[in-house]
């Protein structure tokens, strides 16, 4: 292992060839279906058009042994400074190189892109511990979730409709170009004379009970124009939204408001930023646009 580590090279994924090599490695490691790989390769030039790279990889001689993909979420203005937000996704290392080489790989990422803000929305327990150890922080969020059976009697005159992405009004300090991703919808919720805008992500996961397989459909609210209103009318909105999206479960992360009597669930959203005023970044234009 010591001898092999002398040949390790850290590289930015810039060219089409680099991207193809990294995606081929990740497809094999994560056992993706080929259409996911094709989607990454076709979408990344658009997603990362304001960057000149698509991620990083590590090679031992000429063999890819680790890779991380980047999704450019946009820009955020912090204390009169405009900084890019990068969602790190699909972090995978060859089994023989896990441990210290993995941590060194992450440290390279943070040093090479020291003026960028990094997010991670999909870390498992092991990855979360490693990321926290090197300086990532947990986003200050509380997660609420509700099954359709728990909201079924919350009738209301709330109306929901799909709207064009250009109709959404994202926060003033965020600059981003919204893209139609897989399972992504832009919605308007009308409550009496008030209107609430949402970006949602629908996932269809395969589940099995007593050997019988079925599709488990979950909708996640990844952004809202008015968190206080969403929290106030949580169960009524859930009822309408689950029916509208044909889902069985609704999930949402709240920053300062939280639905009354809702149970707080754990979330695994992380970020790396040297500015103490930032508590969270919504997962808009993140890996959720492509991956489940």
Describe the residue ranges of each PLM region:
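Conserved catalytic-core motifs of GNAT/GCN5-like acyltransferases
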Residues: 137-153, 271-281
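C-terminal functional modules
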Residues: 266-292
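A conserved mid-domain beta-alpha-beta active-site/ligand-binding segment of alpha/beta enzyme cores
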Residues: 151-153, 157-220
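Conserved beta-strand in the GNAT
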Residues: 57, 63-73, 87, 193-210
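Recognition helices and adjacent regulatory flanks at domain boundaries
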Residues: 33-34, 39-59, 65, 104-111, ...
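Acyl-donor binding region in acyl/amide transferases
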Residues: 78-144, 212-269
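Short amphipathic alpha-helix that is part of the acyltransferase structural core
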Residues: 2-43, 87, 142-178, 288-292
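A short helix-loop-beta-strand connector motif used in the catalytic cores of GNAT acetyltransferases and
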Residues: 45-57, 178-194, 246-248
């Amino acid at each position: 292992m010591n001898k092999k580590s002398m040949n390790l090279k850290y590289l930015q994924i810039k060219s089409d060839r680099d991207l193809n090599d990294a995606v081929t490695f990740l497809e094999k490691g994560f056992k993706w279906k080929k259409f996911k790989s094709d989607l990454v390769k076709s979408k990344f030039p658009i997603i990362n058009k304001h960057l000149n790279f698509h991620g990083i990889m590590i090679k031992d001689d000429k063999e890819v042994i680790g890779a991380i993909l980047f999704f450019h979420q946009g820009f955020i203005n912090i204390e009169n400074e405009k900084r890019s937000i990068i969602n790190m996704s699909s972090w995978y290392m060859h089994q023989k190189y896990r441990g210290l080489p993995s941590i060194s790989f992450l440290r390279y990422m943070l040093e090479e892109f020291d003026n960028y803000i990094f997010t991670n929305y999909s870390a498992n327990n092991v990855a979360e511990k490693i990321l926290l150890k090197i300086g990532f922080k947990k986003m200050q969020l509380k997660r609420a979730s509700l099954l359709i059976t728990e909201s079924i009697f919350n009738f209301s005159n709330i109306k929901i409709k799909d709207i064009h992405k250009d109709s959404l009004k994202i926060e003033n300090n965020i600059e981003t170009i919204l893209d139609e991703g897989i399972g992504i919808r832009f919605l308007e919720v009308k409550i009496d004379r008030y209107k609430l805008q949402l970006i949602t992500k629908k996932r269809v996961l395969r589940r099995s009970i007593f050997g019988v397989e079925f599709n488990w459909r979950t909708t996640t609210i990844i952004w809202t124009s008015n968190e206080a209103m969403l929290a106030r009318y949580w169960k009524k909105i859930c009822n309408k939204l689950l029916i509208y999206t044909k889902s069985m479960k609704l999930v949402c992360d709240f920053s300062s408001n939280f639905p009354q009597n809702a149970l707080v669930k754990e979330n695994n959203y992380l970020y790396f930023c040297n500015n103490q005023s930032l508590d969270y970044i919504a997962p808009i234009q993140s890996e959720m646009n492509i991956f489940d």
